[in-house]
């Protein structure tokens, strides 16, 4: 029985041969194809696979019937009889098979009316793969002859091969790192993993070091192979080193995925050019062909029901993926009209998309009416002079109209205080289908400017005073509000703790601890506008158990105070980190033992509460746009409350490469459509909710640790997603993956998430404590490697940025306790 390792090796070799076994194609040559060439029936089926041990005989039988002539090819090259190859009828026999006989074999049966091809995939296995050095055909470049008398320290001989530092590849693939170097005397090479010596016993299956090629080879990589690999080259005159980072992506095998809408229907005129594009995504090496549907004797299908097809373009030995994904047709004729198909296959299956080409007759050129060049030039000059004259008259008229006599302030004995009312308009974040009756253009305050005399000051002073309208429903007396200690500084102000007497109308004489948002001393008009907009947004949203609710405001006779609910246990991210068990590799404080150990049900409860809060915001047509654990607060009774949903954000001026004050990148919570197209919807909030779930089940982990922003953009476009957290069931992880669906319409709604989480929470017992100290399974497709955990104490071993207090949120003391609904 073939072992799993040999089976994986077979699949890899098979897909490699698929990419090499297609004859090269030139479109210019295709235009000269003889029209009487019989069409080929394309066999859309799984090729037969043969596995032969070295030294054995390989025998293939062509299963095609009624063949006048049978011809054989290997990797697109015709096969003839020799001392090892025997051709007898429909049989092909190769004696003493070697690994070089591996490849793609095809038999073609030529008939009087058509031809048909049958494909075989052959793999001659060997104990040690002979393909380790397939990329080393240019190894002569790495060997540098040194003059014996020219002693020198090590140096790199081929830096072009070392430019790609970050390598992301699917699991079970082979990875090779190279460090071509020279030096005299001859240098030695050692490899380190994560700064420590890399030994054979550190990896199941070991690894290979090819000193003559300065390379490290790891076969069948798994998630535990993630990390930094450093080659250290040294001799007695010095040493040099180079580091690669490997990220292993565990993904389920699937047939090729073709981008929707490609290739697209096209139309052109006779003599024009056209191109069809086919975007193929596949973990395994895909084989791509371009096919045209043709007719034979007025029929598109043969007697057996199979369509008549002609292969126009296929991958050859020197063809790249980018070249094969585009089909160019030059100097189009009416015969080129018809249906074209892009077909891609791998070892899992086949996918195809079709498009139609419509050829139109060339338009008849109308007789050009040419005006006299003299009259045309005169007309241009006249129009230009007229436009310039109009501009000059307009400028003079505007200046005469706006010129007024300026007041002489030096003759006035008193100082004038400028009282300015800031023009604010409602800046609410609502979806396009919002049916709110409140007009977003209704002005909150109209601008007025007046000069008032005061004789107490000796010189002019410009003082801005903000006059806001009073809202009786929300206005709270200042004399009943006692400010306390600061809790933190926000984006446009600060937050302090306070005691509000009578803010709870059911208990008019009882003091309630609240949080008060206010402007800083150096606040600008924009800061005031943002704070008022947030207050107005919270008024419109209303109250819910799982959001930070507005309690009141002080807008008259003093600075603006916005009074909101107080959450004593701070933000959710630090709340989870403070409750990480001791001994956990990424423990927040390894010397502190938590008073209560969190259960799996506690984490599900956190997720359920936040889903309820987002369901309510979505029902109020509110799009959050910055949903993350740092923007969730926890109350004394462990109730999750979503914060900062009313902040005004300028989505057109986001610096996607700029870190926040705590060193983390907000783009890691953003959906692809928000990241690349700046489209914010409820579906983009669902994506962020999936990342928030991942933060919860990693107990405050940082998403995509150590991945640069540029690489993150690339990985998201390629379909990469984060692995399953340790403390997460497959059902919850699939819920995260649904939230991260590339198509926004395919993501679940918050209503569906609430229903699913409610069911999971009901079936979960209270005794399921988190056992985070157990080692992770090295070959599990959903568990990351413990040696390179994605949630280390400082968020990432690759990002040494410090973690100060959260921006826009207060810092609260941590109080242990389980999470309850």
UniProtKB/Swiss-Prot annotation:
Residues 1-21 form the signal peptide. The modification Phosphotyrosine is found at residues 466, 586, 588, 656-657, 769. GO terms for cellular component: cytoplasmic vesicle; excitatory synapse; extracellular region; Golgi apparatus; nucleus; plasma membrane. Disruption phenotype: Embryonic lethality shortly after implantation, due to trophoblast defects, absence of a functional placenta, failure of limb bud formation, plus defects in lung branching and heart development. GO terms for biological process: angiogenesis; animal organ morphogenesis; axonogenesis; bone development; bone mineralization; bone morphogenesis; branch elongation involved in salivary gland morphogenesis; branching involved in labyrinthine layer morphogenesis. It is found in: Cell membrane; Golgi apparatus; Cytoplasmic vesicle. Residues 131-144 have a biased composition (Acidic residues). GO terms for molecular function: ATP binding; fibroblast growth factor binding; fibroblast growth factor receptor activity; heparin binding. The second and third Ig-like domains directly interact with fibroblast growth factors (FGF) and heparan sulfate proteoglycans. Alternative splicing events affecting the third Ig-like domain are crucial for ligand selectivity. This is Fibroblast growth factor receptor 2. It comes from Mus musculus (Mouse). The lineage of its organism: Eukaryota, Metazoa, Chordata, Craniata, Vertebrata. The gene is Fgfr2.
């Amino acid at each position: 029985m073939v072992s799993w390792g040999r089976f994986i090796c077979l699949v890899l070799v098979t897909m490699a041969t698929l990419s090499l076994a297609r004859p090269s194609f030139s479109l210019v040559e295709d235009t000269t194809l003889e029209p009487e060439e019989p069409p080929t029936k394309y066999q859309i089926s799984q090729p037969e696979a043969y596995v032969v041990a070295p030294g054995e005989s390989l025998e293939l039988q062509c299963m095609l019937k009624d063949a006048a002539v049978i011809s054989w090819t290997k990797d697109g090259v015709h096969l003839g009889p020799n001392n090892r190859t025997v051709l007898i009828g429909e049989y092909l026999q190769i004696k003493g098979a070697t690994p070089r006989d591996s490849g793609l074999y095809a038999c073609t049966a030529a008939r009087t009316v058509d031809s048909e091809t049958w494909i075989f995939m052959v793999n001659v296995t060997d104990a040690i793969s002979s393909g380790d050095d397939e990329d080393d055909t240019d190894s002569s470049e790495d060997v540098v002859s040194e003059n014996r008398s020219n002693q020198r320290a090590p140096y790199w001989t081929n830096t072009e091969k070392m430019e790609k530092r970050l390598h992301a590849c699917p699991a079970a693939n082979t990875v090779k790192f190279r460090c071509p170097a020279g030096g005299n005397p001859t240098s030695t090479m050692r490899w380190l993993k994560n700064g420590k010596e890399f030994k054979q016993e550190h990896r199941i299956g070991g690894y290979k070091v090819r000193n003559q090629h300065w390379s490290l080879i790891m076969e069948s990589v798994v998630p535990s192979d993630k990390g930094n690999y450093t080659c250290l080259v040294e001799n007695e005159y010095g040493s040099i080193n180079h580091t690669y980072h490997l990220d292993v992506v565990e993904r389920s095998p699937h047939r090729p995925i073709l981008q929707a809408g490609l290739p697209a229907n096209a139309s052109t005129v006779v003599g024009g050019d056209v191109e069809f594009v086919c975007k193929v995504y596949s973990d395994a090496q895909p084989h791509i062909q371009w096919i045209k549907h043709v007719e034979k004797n007025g029929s598109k299908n043969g007697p057996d029901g199979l369509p008549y097809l002609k292969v126009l373009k296929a991958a050859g030995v020197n063809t790249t993926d980018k070249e094969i994904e585009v089909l160019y047709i030059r100097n189009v004729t009416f015969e080129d009209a018809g249906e074209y198909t892009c077909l891609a296959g791998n070892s899992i299956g086949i996918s195809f998309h079709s498009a139609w080409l419509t050829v139109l007759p060339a338009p008849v050129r109308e007789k050009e009416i040419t005006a006299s060049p003299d009259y045309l030039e005169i007309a241009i000059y006249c129009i230009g002079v007229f436009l310039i004259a109009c501009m000059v008259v307009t400028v003079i008229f505007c200046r005469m109209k706006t010129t007024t006599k300026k007041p002489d302030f030096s003759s006035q004995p008193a100082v004038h205080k400028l009282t300015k009312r800031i023009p604010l308009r409602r800046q609410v974040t609502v979806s396009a289908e919002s049916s709110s009756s409140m007009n977003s253009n209704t002005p909150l305050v109209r601008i007025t400017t007046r000069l008032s005399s005061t004789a107490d000051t000796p010189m002019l002073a410009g003082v801005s005073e903000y006059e806001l309208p009073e809202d009786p429903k929300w206005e709270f007396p200042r004399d009943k509000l006692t400010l306390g200690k600061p809790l933190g500084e926000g984006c446009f102000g600060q937050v302090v703790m306070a005691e509000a007497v009578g803010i709870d109308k059911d208990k008019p004489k009882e003091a309630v601890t609240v949080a008060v948002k206010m402007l800083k001393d150096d606040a600008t008009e924009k800061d005031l506008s943002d704070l008022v907009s947030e207050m107005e947004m919270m008024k419109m949203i209303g109250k819910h158990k799982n959001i930070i609710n507005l309690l009141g405001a002080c807008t008259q006779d003093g600075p603006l105070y916005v009074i909101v609910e107080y959450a004593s246990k701070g933000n959710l991210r630090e709340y989870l980190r403070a409750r990480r068990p001791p001994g956990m590799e990424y423990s927040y404080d390894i010397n502190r033992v938590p008073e209560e150990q969190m259960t799996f049900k506690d984490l599900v409860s956190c997720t359920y509460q936040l889903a309820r809060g987002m369901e309510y915001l979505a029902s109020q047509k509110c799009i959050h746009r910055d949903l993350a654990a740092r923007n969730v607060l926890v109350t004394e009774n462990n109730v999750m409350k979503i914060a900062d949903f009313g902040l005004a954000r300028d989505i057109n001026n986001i610096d996607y490469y700029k870190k926040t004050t705590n060193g983390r990148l907000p783009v890691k919570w953003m959906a692809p459509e928000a990241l690349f197209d700046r489209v914010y919807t409820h579906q983009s909030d669902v994506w962020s909710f999936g990342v928030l779930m991942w933060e919860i089940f990693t107990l405050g982990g940082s998403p995509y640790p150590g991945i640069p922003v540029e690489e993150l953009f690339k990985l998201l476009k390629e379909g990469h997603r984060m692995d399953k957290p340790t403390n997460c069931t497959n059902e919850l992880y699939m819920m995260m993956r649904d939230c991260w669906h590339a198509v926004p319409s395919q993501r679940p709604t918050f209503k569906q998430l609430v229903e699913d989480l409610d069911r999971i929470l009901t079936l979960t017992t209270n005794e399921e404590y988190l056992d985070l100290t157990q080692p992770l399974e090295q070959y599990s497709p959903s568990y990351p490697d413990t040696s390179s955990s994605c949630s280390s104490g400082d968020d990432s071993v690759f990002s040494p940025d410090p973690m100060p207090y959260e921006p826009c949120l207060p810092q609260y003391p941590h109080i242990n306790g389980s999470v309850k609904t």
